[in-house]
């Protein structure tokens, strides 16, 4: 955030976490119930619920709609601002260090939800299927997708954005690991360009046994 803003993201995130760590159930509790107590802390600058919600809105990203070769339409959300803040926060807290190399894992997770835009997944429930990148036990990138999206559809672009964001922050991937949902020529070629070694499980097919 611009330094001329009243609160930085670090202060806003601390205020948001205080809601849940102090027994609150919604963001508004920070103003109505917790502010008078949190204000006694000598170094914690606690912001109002309105400020927290405005900051969250600043980080939102409009969906991008893609059309497949077969004519089907899928919504993606790249969450660029949120992902950039995520990487910066991991660097600021020392969970990632610039100049070091890490092992990188990527997979799609299926999240069940009853939201209005949820789509049927192959797991037989409505939801989303975000692509999630992890280093160790911390998430370093996440992009949401419709639940009915084929796992390989535009996966190359998703991975490339995540790799480039990490590289721009000085974080490099030594080894990348993915399951057979990433086993395609274009995805393998892109992954190879951004890491020293990669492990991608091959699809089961008759040619493997020939």
Please report, for each region that a protein language model flagged, where it lies by residue.
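Short, basic interhelical loop/turn and adjoining N-cap
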Residues: 4-5, 35-54
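Electropositive, glycine- and tryptophan-enriched low-complexity nucleic-acid-binding patches
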Residues: 121-169
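Catalytic or ion-translocation cores adjacent to nucleophile or general acid/base/metal-coordination motifs
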Residues: 144, 153, 192-210
């Amino acid at each position: 955030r611009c330094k001329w803003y009243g609160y930085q993201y670090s202060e806003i995130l601390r205020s948001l976490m205080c809601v849940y760590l102090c027994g609150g159930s919604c963001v508004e509790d920070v103003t109505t119930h917790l502010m008078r107590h949190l204000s006694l802390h000598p170094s914690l600058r606690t912001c109002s619920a309105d400020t927290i919600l405005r900051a969250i809105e600043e980080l939102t990203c409009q969906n991008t709609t893609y059309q497949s070769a077969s004519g089907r339409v899928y919504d993606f959300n790249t969450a660029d601002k949120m992902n950039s803040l995520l990487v910066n926060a991991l660097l600021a807290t020392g969970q990632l260090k610039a100049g070091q190399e890490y092992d990188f894992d990527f997979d799609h997770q299926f999240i069940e939800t009853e939201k209005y835009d949820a789509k049927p997944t192959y797991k037989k429930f409505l939801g989303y299927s975000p692509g999630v990148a992890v280093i160790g036990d911390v998430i370093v990138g996440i992009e949401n997708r419709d639940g009915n999206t084929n796992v390989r559809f535009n996966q190359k672009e998703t991975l490339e954005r995540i790799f480039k964001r990490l590289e721009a922050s000085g974080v490099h991937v030594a080894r990348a690991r993915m399951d057979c949902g990433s086993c395609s020529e274009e995805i393998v070629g892109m992954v190879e360009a951004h890491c020293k070694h990669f492990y991608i499980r091959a699809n089961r097919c008759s040619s493997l046994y020939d």
